[in-house]
Amino acid sequence: MPASPGAGSGRVAMSTNKVIEYNSTETDAILIKSETISDDINAMSLSKGELTVKGGMTSHAAVIARGMGIPCIVGARNVVFKEKEKILILDDGNVISEGDEITIDGSTGAIYLEKVKLRPPETTTTFSTLLQWAGEFCDIQIRANADTV
């Protein structure tokens, strides 16, 4: 289930310590867990995306990922997660192991078994004009998620 929009690529990390290890070598990580807990917050902030087997739109992983602006897929119930073996078996039989490069799309829930070249979103001139008008004519200001801008 898509839970936080955007896409992220990196090496699969199935523990908080593995994300931290990858980060120390400037390697992008995708955190995969059965579910996240508050102890995972550091790894979540360092990862380029998250995938959990359990959870829904109001689960810990989904709420934290949206707040941090990190792509996230939750409730991937059609997969088999073998935590001890550090593998994730997809419904089509493909196996993702810790260290594999993958890409996740938090907008659609898609998992790609390779590192997909990503590009940052483009700001159109129409959107820029709309923001300019809003700035000129607004009587109030709205501030939200300043840490993700």
Give, region by region, the residue ranges found by the protein language model.
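Acidic, glycine-rich flexible loop/linker segments
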Residues: M1-A29, S34-V149
